[in-house]
UniProtKB/Swiss-Prot annotation:
Bias (Polar residues): 1-10
Pfam family, one: LCE6A
Domain of life from the UniProt record: Eukaryota
Taxonomic lineage from the root: Eukaryota, Metazoa, Chordata, Craniata, Vertebrata
The gene coding this protein: LCE6A
Disordered, as annotated region: 1-21, 35-60
Further information: Belongs to the LCE cluster present on 1q21.
Protein name: Late cornified envelope protein 6A
GO annotation (BP), single: keratinization
UniProt function note: Precursors of the cornified envelope of the stratum corneum.
Family the UniProt entry places it in: Belongs to the LCE family.
InterPro entries: LCE6A
Species, as recorded: Homo sapiens
Keywords: Keratinization
Amino acid sequence: MSQQKQQSWKPPNVPKCSPPQRSNPCLAPYSTPCGAPHSEGCHSSSQRPEVQKPRRARQKLRCLSRGTTYHCKEEECEGD
């Protein structure tokens, strides 16, 4: 009887814990990289506007391949 309880107690614990844990880590990394790396990249571009002008097009291509990343970076760079 105790074995059945242990087995039935583990399965519900794993699925219940995995969805929330996956959601939280996913949300944090997405928002953090979107703000920090992008602002840094855009800041460095503002330091070298002449050199970054041609490179901006390449950066956009790289951002596009990433998907959601390009949206964040585009807003940051456009605001520049």
